[in-house]
């Protein structure tokens, strides 16, 4: 189901939440799983696939910008950051960000976490379970995954040719997943977004 609500990034450069007033999931706190706005995530991906939102640093020259872009899309669809030190998922500026915001492996660990905290949550899934707004991660060589494209089109895909992605480093939109030469693929389905139970509706 696609939920139509104003995304925090839809019209460019909305200010980020203040971490001093951040929403952290504390052990025992009430968290509600709410729908992920897939349409907002995909619209953001299309808007910035070949550009750079000036509210975010461009990591192209220092390791790549793919997971930074993926996190921006996730934020567009979730509307909340997790300012938990070290293990959270947030961006304040180029130097103040969580490892999960820009790191392929760290983002995977964050999305599939068991720790209760606010923010998007996901699980590894099969190719046919991918939906627009989900992520795929690719391993080209070595033992670690190195790329985090965003799914912009998929409908019970039976092959990677039927999954289209947007990405940074290298910039792409509507690119068939089959066009990548990778050794391993993992698919991440976003199940929803954890919010404090008392927070206003998205």
Language-model features: where?
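Short hydrophobic transmembrane-like helices used for membrane targeting/insertion
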Residues: 1-3, 13
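Intrinsically disordered, low-complexity segments enriched in serine/proline and basic residues
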Residues: 6, 15-17
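N-terminal capping segments
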Residues: 20-102
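Residue-level marker of positions within ordered structural domains that often coincide
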Residues: 50, 74-75, 141, 154, ...
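...with weaker cross-activation on analogous glycine-rich loops/strands in unrelated enzymes
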Residues: 90-165
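Glycine-rich, aromatic-bearing surface loops/beta-hairpins
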Residues: 150-202
